[in-house]
Amino acid sequence: MARTTPIGRYRNIGIVAHVDAGKTTTTERVLFYTGKSHKMGEVHDGAATTDWMVQEQERGITITSAAITAFWQGSEKQHKDQFRFNVIDTPGHVDFTIEVERSLRVLDGAVVVFCGTSGVEPQSETVWRQANKYGVPRIVYVNKMDRAGANFLRVIAQIKQRLGHTPVPIQLAIGAEDNFQGQIDLMSMEAVYWNDADKGMVPVRKPIPAELQELADEWRSNMVEAAAEASEELMNKYVDGEELTNDEIKAALRQRTIAGEIVLAVCGSSFKNKGVPLVLDAVIDYLPAPTDIPAIKGSDPDNEEKLMERHADDNEPFSALAFKIATDPFVGTLTFVRVYSGVLASGDGVINSVKGKKERVGRMVQMHANAREEIKEVRAGDIAALIGMKDVTTGETLCNADKPIILVRMDFPEPVISVAVEPKTKDDQEKMGIALGKLAQEDPSFRVKTDEETGQTIISGMGELHLDILVDRMRREFNVEANIGKPQVSYRERITKNCEIEGKFVRQSGGRGQFGHCWIRFAPADEGQEGLQFVNEVVGGVVPKEYIPAIQKGIEEQMKNGVVAGYPLIGLKATVFDGSYHDVDSNEMAFKVAASMATKQLAQKGGGELLEPIMAVEVVTPEDYMGDVMGDLNRRRGMILGMEDTVSGKVIRAEVPLGEMFGYATDVRSMSQGRASYSMEFKKYNTAPSHIVETVTKKQG
């Protein structure tokens, strides 16, 4: 089958933002204007087409990023052919940053939505940081221009100040709040208005109102200057006072946006149907096609040192990244993939190069909001869901078995909070095991383990809301009723002293014995190293090369058990520098045990300390309650970092230990009569004070 849309007309984009910037409403409008959903869904009435899990509709927030395929030819049909958009809607709640992170990983560009009133909020910073990490070109869309206190240019200034990027507006707002009427298009230098009759489908262009002409001229020259900086040739033309054509300006702005040098900004009101078609036009004009960005990097499964790459081309070997696993009541497991290269037809065999397992693709579907279309093949640049994958987890690579590659992996954060779950009845016991397994496969930031001493099932995640929603899904989707214990903090441990320790494991009693012997130098790891930093300094073959990995494994396994109170050890540098072996009795197992015994001795010799997770907390509160909120944060051992005034109230930034924040949602509401809101995300681990160490050690017995 031939390709229906050339890859140059693909746009794989995400719509990202923080809670309540109006992101899902914007996605809804995108679907409406691109003709895929003829009834607009509103988040207010719980009918939005991308929010398809029941909890999302109830809570009015988006949890799973649905991938939707849509087509667009331009707001005034200015393009000869249609462009194919694959749009990924992402959650903005900080407990789901992992969802945002993995969506950004497979996107080529993003539309970052800000609220015209509240501007840059705590979560916008998180999302912006993630987009920087993956080098995603983006456009800023300032939404909710019809809201009281909305001000486009103020938000632009805030982005510059708080996010360190200077946005280049390609539009200005005409009016604001109740009087918001439309935009000034700085490219064509016209005013653009919208009709309620066609729900803001087709822009109506008129001359710029006289009172805004001067402002428009000023920002037009700002835009032209940004374009001129794209090349020496344009700069010379600009300096010589020659006019740049709109085509030259567009091409230059596109080039600089894709290179990540500038961020273009547009405005509108999705809810009032004023402006989304122009956002779609900007996506076509300024965001990259899969062929405009560098080839994806990867490594050879047999030799991680050997780097490889795949270009966005149908003729290259097939490679794709699984970026989301969803359980569907009708077809079972859906594996959402982004195809980077090659072609895959249904029925083909592929290999999961991370696990080295073969998989056969059953059916393939593309999602259009909440309808599905079955397709026969996927090609480079496509995003689709595969049905029939047996053992694929988020972040793994599917590729051609003859030409395997492991695409750059995603990093998933370690969970910071745990609770015990117990099934209510015997029947629930087995169902709960299956349900938790499926949920963990979908969400790598959610972990399940069994406590060996108590036999309890412990689930861990990124925050209270994260675990609440997972337990809720277990009840709804898998009919499992469970009792939930009190949240527990996931502490960590580290050593503070340098020491040299001998690990020796000898068992020789007739026949084949065991002999492992090593000397290890332990120290706190170098800055920025979170896990084990393992160094081999053995010379002269006193410990044969083949036993070195076993020593590393022995240390890693023992690190899980800690040295103070049984919590995992982090930031450890271990240098194996000496030892001995026995020709007959030495084997990998013996060296693993020897290394494990050496690591155990850190409890006496390593000066271990307990670390507690510290959260970055931002509370937005009306001024009347500020004293109470700050006093309360201080009582929770919080460190206030600063405050600022915003339209929505005072913003207090603080760092607070997670252990003191349980139940904060209820407390902050009652303190402020329901008017304050807060967000928090994991920041770092800090040394825990002595009273916490005492309580924790006592509890661990």
Curated annotation (Swiss-Prot):
Residues 8-291 form the tr-type G domain. Coiled coil: none annotated. Its main location: cytoplasm. GO terms for cellular component: cytoplasm. It is found in: Cytoplasm. It comes from the Bacteria. GTP binds at residues 17-24, 89-93, 143-146. Keywords: Cytoplasm, Elongation factor, GTP-binding, Nucleotide-binding, Protein biosynthesis. InterPro entries: EFG_II (IPR041095), EFG_III (IPR009022), EFG_III/V (IPR035647), EFG_IV (IPR047872), EFG_V (IPR035649), EFG_V-like (IPR000640), EFTu-like_2 (IPR004161), G_TR_CS (IPR031157). One of its GO terms (biological process) is ribosome disassembly. GO terms for molecular function: GTP binding; GTPase activity; guanosine tetraphosphate binding; translation elongation factor activity. Pfam families: EFG_C (PF00679), EFG_III (PF14492), EFG_IV (PF03764), GTP_EFTU (PF00009), GTP_EFTU_D2 (PF03144). Catalyzes the GTP-dependent ribosomal translocation step during translation elongation. During this step, the ribosome changes from the pre-translocational (PRE) to the post-translocational (POST) state as the newly formed A-site-bound peptidyl-tRNA and P-site-bound deacylated tRNA move to the P and E sites, respectively. Catalyzes the coordinated movement of the two tRNA molecules, the mRNA and conformational changes in the ribosome. HAMAP family: EF_G_EF_2_B. Belongs to the TRAFAC class translation factor GTPase superfamily. Classic translation factor GTPase family. EF-G/EF-2 subfamily. This is Elongation factor G. It comes from Pseudomonas syringae pv. syringae (strain B728a).
